[in-house]
Amino acid sequence: MLRRLGLSGFRIALAVLGFFFLLWWFGMRMPGRNISTAAPLSAAEIALRADLIADVQKLAGEIGERNLQHYAQLNTAADFIEGSFSRAGLQPRRDTYELQGRACHNIETEIRGARPQIVVIGAHYDSVFGSPGANDNASGVAALLALARRFAGKPAGQTLRFVAFVNEEPPYFQTEQMGSFVYARGCKARGDQISAMLSLETIGY
């Protein structure tokens, strides 16, 4: 009798374990057909890829290292960003301040929205000393320009403000000489109603 009860208990335990295994399996399995390869790019995605590559190549490959040690290249990068905003049908402006006796420029443009709140989308365009800065941060600037082109001429709920910041790398990083710090201080002084800030930083290339 005890032997039968033990055998029955074992069968019940096995059935319970099997039930929970089936629950786990059905919960974890993905429905539908598995796709092992990426979907082909659309024509718009192919064009976007080409623009991103071209902008990174322009900043890192053609202009190269851009910081106060390479001041001419820093200004060339600022001119390129300003021109890219203009070619997208936007109206860029320079937020200029002086550092080490030299004029440094944050480049901004905006798409006015129906409400006064502002969303800032930013990326720094200077590179660390000794580097052409393809990933850090030509990749972020390329994305910034792509977003500006994408939203240009389209209605927006909140104002979209695109800003390319200067002097974010050491020795200015986390100091009051950073372009973004100078810019934020100016926004506060003006009373800008900034509701969010999105930083595009080192996103790969």
Where on the chain are the PLM-derived regions?
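Acidic/histidine-rich catalytic neighborhood of metal-dependent amide-processing enzymes
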Residues: V128-Y205
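Soluble periplasmic/extracytoplasmic beta-strand elements of cell-envelope proteins
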Residues: K58, N106-E110, I118-H124, T159-F165, ...
